[in-house]
Amino acid sequence: MFSLEAWIGLRYLRAKKRNGFMSFITMVSIAGIALGVTALIVVLSVMNGFQKEIRGQLLNVAPHAEIGYIDNTDTDWRNLLRFTENRKGILAAAPYVSNQALLANAGEIRGVQIRGILPSEERKVVEYGDKMPAGKFEDLIPGEFDIILGVGLAEALGAEVGNKVTVITPEGNVTPAGVVPRLKQFTVVGLVKTGVYEVDNSLAMTHIQDARVLYRLDKEVAGLRLKLADPQNAPALTAKLIPEAQRDTVWVRDWTFSNRSYFEAVELEKRMMFIILTLIIAVAAFNLVSSLVMAVTEKQADIAILRTLGLSPGGVMKIFMVQGAFSGFFGTLAGVVCGVLLGWNVGRVVAFFENLLGVHLINSQVYFIDYLPSDVDMGDVALIACISLGLSFVATLYPSRRASKTQPAEALRYE
């Protein structure tokens, strides 16, 4: 059963207003709250989806964890395996060397990170080896100086399978004429497509033995790339991987460390968007204050009569708090329903407008993906609803308190 104050407050909310403008302001405030809640849910859902998709893309092309010697005193990469063997959660490990270089072909030059790999082991730690547009990892034959390029890099260089490209390394050769760059011809034997624009435009792989020759290494490796059963558990697993006594000679890092700056930037953007869009709800709550103040002014005679019948100032305050709170509740409810429905279907909505207008809004060269992902988090929805209801409740305090201070004699003097 509703209390008297709640019953009167709901009756005031449903009653036809004598002042049409006041009714309009009330509807605007409810619509404003609904719009703010909808926008906040949709934006956070898109950012959640974007973060989830990019995390999935990165985990397909990047190692889940890496391990290596700090000073490279031990040149046998198999000795590193003792840290990973019989470890629950580690599925595979592959050695690698890595260094910077320039690739040149047909007058085009691009900066790249050349990775020396062991084909039989590399296939075990990355997903894209089975979906190469041309060639395969096993085409990298030691001593042949073969190279596999990302599709974007190959396109930028104008290189195709079978072409030779020139690799220019940072280390130079000392000649009587001075120091000149070291040049080496490599044959393109394959193309790889990871789906991540940045990787596809900078990735170059060769056999680990050829990479050692190119960079004048002995038997050193940069480290091991690891594939984990549960990448989300990478920080906890890597923290226990190296014994305390050997942490000054062996380093280990996981994918969250390697991509920390990116994910921190996305998380910061999410927080800032949350704050900015919450202001929309706050502005709508201020409209709720205006509508309640006007309602208090219109109901002065009613308030005075209720007071003379024995209703306490606190009871009067509750009436208008109920009226305002239910306005906020209806706005929040409408916003949650619209936000969740739109959040679930925002990809289809964007695709519809792209087809209708003949434009492509999501550029994969900028955003890694060419569609708008969405992941509605019910925890975010609950938080947004609570904030909206809280702001709506706060908005009722001043008008309700003002109504409670109404003096019956003053209010009825001119009635």
Swiss-Prot record:
Cited function: Part of an ATP-dependent transport system responsible for the release of lipoproteins targeted to the outer membrane from the inner membrane. Such a release is dependent of the sorting-signal (absence of an Asp at position 2 of the mature lipoprotein) and of LolA.
Segments traversing the membrane: 24-44, 273-293, 324-344, 378-398
GO terms under cellular component: plasma membrane protein complex
Name of the protein described by the UniProt record: Lipoprotein-releasing system transmembrane protein LolC
Membrane topology: Multi-pass membrane protein
Source domain of life: Bacteria
Keywords: Cell inner membrane, Cell membrane, Membrane, Transmembrane, Transmembrane helix, Transport
Family in the record: Belongs to the ABC-4 integral membrane protein family. LolC/E subfamily.
Native source species: Neisseria meningitidis serogroup A / serotype 4A (strain DSM 15465 / Z2491)
